[in-house]
Amino acid sequence: MKKLTFSFISPERPIVQNQEADFVALPAFEGEMGVLPGHVNSVVILMPGFVRFKNNGEEKEFAIIDGFAEVFKDHIDVFASEASLSEEKQSEEQKQRLERAKKALSSQDADIDIELAEIQLKTQILKMKMKKRKM
């Protein structure tokens, strides 16, 4: 069976480099998008959600906030502004970020960027959901 070559990059580090995959699922703007070898070439806008890839029955999953993917017939490159692997433990710093985002949203301070606070809150909630799904 043909395989895709899968790479996943975030600003912090390359998360996956040139890994073989049978299937990749992306949280696309229009909904979840599945990619198999031979897929039509495309650029996909990614939304908050989970990127999954399967190889030989083994599946890995990552939480992302946003990004884009370049899909080709034989490979796929995912670029995410922030991502975390499901096996990574939630740090105390992530918990503090969640609390700060909640406080910023509930604040009546005119200097608060509400859109940014909402994104930060969604980011932290998504990461917590990732941890709960794997427990």
Swiss-Prot record:
Cystines in this chain: none
GO cellular component, one term: proton-transporting ATP synthase complex
Membrane topology annotation: Peripheral membrane protein
Gene Ontology molecular-function annotations: ATP binding; proton-transporting ATP synthase activity, rotational mechanism
Family of the protein in this entry: Belongs to the ATPase epsilon chain family.
Function statement: Produces ATP from ADP in the presence of a proton gradient across the membrane.
Protein name (Swiss-Prot/TrEMBL): ATP synthase epsilon chain
